[in-house]
Amino acid sequence: MSVTISEAVKYIGVDDKTIDLFESQYVVPHGVSYNSYLILDEKVALMDTVDTRGVEQWEKNLLAALDGRKVDYLIVSHLEPDHAGSIGRLVELFPEVTLVGNAKTFQMLPQFFDELPVDENHKITVAEGESLSLGTHTLNFYMAPMVHWPEVMVTYESSEKILFSADGFGKFGALDYEDPEGWACEARRYYFNIVGKYGAPVQALLKKAAGLDIQTICPLHGPVLKENLGYYIGLYDTWSSYKPENQGVLVAYASIHGNTAKAAQKFAEMLRAKGVEKVSVMDLSRDDMAEVVEDAFRYDRMVLAAASYDGGVFPCMQDFLHHLQSKAYQNRTVGIIENGTWGPTAGRTMKGILETMKDITIVDPMVTIRSTMKESDLPAMEALADVIANA
C-alpha cells in the first residue's frame, strides 16, 4: 500500500495478510503491518526493518526508494523479531551500514544475531536526548524502556516534527483494511494485550512526548497518524493510567453445559432493564480472549459468571483472570456469579484471584446458582444487578 509521509521520509513497510496469530496467540483476521521508514538526506537513515515473513517485499520497497543510494544508518528502535528480523539481510545488502541503538540494544543484539558481521566501528550507542544529524534532518533519541521491551527507544525528527514511536500507537490490521469501528478498536486490543502491563513506562514516555512539537506519529504497526493527534495521545493517557475509557459492564462467562451462560444472559438483560446502556457479553470458551481483555479494560465494571470445576473454577475463566492479572488489571468494580452442583467453588476461586489485583472492588451479593438458574435465584441476581448498575 502506498503511504505518503513527505518528500524525504518514505514508508517502505509491508502488510502481512497470511498470518493467523500475532505473537502466536492473538488472532488477526485482517492481518498486520510491519512498518519501516526511510529518511533520505545527505545521509540515509532506515528506521527499523520488518519480520522475515515480509523481507522479500520489504527489500524491493527499500531498493526502489533508495534509487541507487545506500543506507548509512539503521536505527534499531526495538529488537523484537517482527521489527528487527531482517537486520541480517540489510547488512548483506549494505555491509558498511552503521547500526544505531542504545546500550541495551547492543547488549541484546547478539542473542538474536550471534554472527552478525558488524564491527564496533559500525555501531553508534546513543543515550537519552542525544542526536544524529543526517543533513537537514536531525534524529533525537529518547529512551522508552519497557514500552514494552527494555531496549525500546523512540526517535523524534525535529525538522519535520515526526515521532517514530516504536510499538507505541500501533494497531492490528493491514494498512489497506478500513476498520468500520475506526482506529481505536484494534489499537485498544493491541495496546492492552501487548503493552498493557506497562502503564507507568507509557506514562513516562507520554511526559517526554509532551515536550515535543509532534505533527506526525510513525508507529511500527498500523497507520501513520497525522491529524487530530490529541485524540490518540489522549487515549494512550487513559489506557496507560488504567482509567476506564467508557462507562459500561463486561459480563464474561465460563459455562460447561450452557446453564451458566443462560444466567449470564439473563443478568445482562437485567442490567439493560436498569438503564445500563453498554453491556458486553462474552463467552470465554469461544470468544477471542484478547477482545475480552480489551473490554475488561475499556469499561468501568465487570461481572464474572462461572461454573465450578475440579475444586476451583472452569479453566477458561481461570485463564482469563490470569490474563487480567498479568496485564495489571485494576481500578474496577466486579461482581461474581458462581454455579455448582454439589460444592460450588468458582466464587471463592475467582474472588481469591481478583484480590491479588490493585484497587478491585468486589461487590455483594455474590450469587450462587445450583446447577440451573431458577425463579428463586432471580432476587439475588436482581440485587447484584442493582449494585452493578448504580456503581
Regions found by a protein language model. Name each.
Residues M47-T49, V71-L79, L99-N102, L163-D167, ...:
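Active-site neighborhood of phospho(di)ester-bond hydrolases with catalytic His/Asp-centered motifs
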Residues L175-I217, H221-V224, K266-M282, V292-A391:
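FMN-binding flavodoxin-like domain, especially the glycine-rich phosphate-binding loop
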Residues K43-A45, Y73, H137, K161-F164, ...:
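Structural motif
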Residues E42, R53-V100:
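Active-site metal-binding motif and surrounding structural segment of the metallo-beta-lactamase
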Residues V3-E7, G101-V152, Y198-A204:
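Metallo-beta-lactamase
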Residues S86, D288-V292:
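Short acidic active-site motifs
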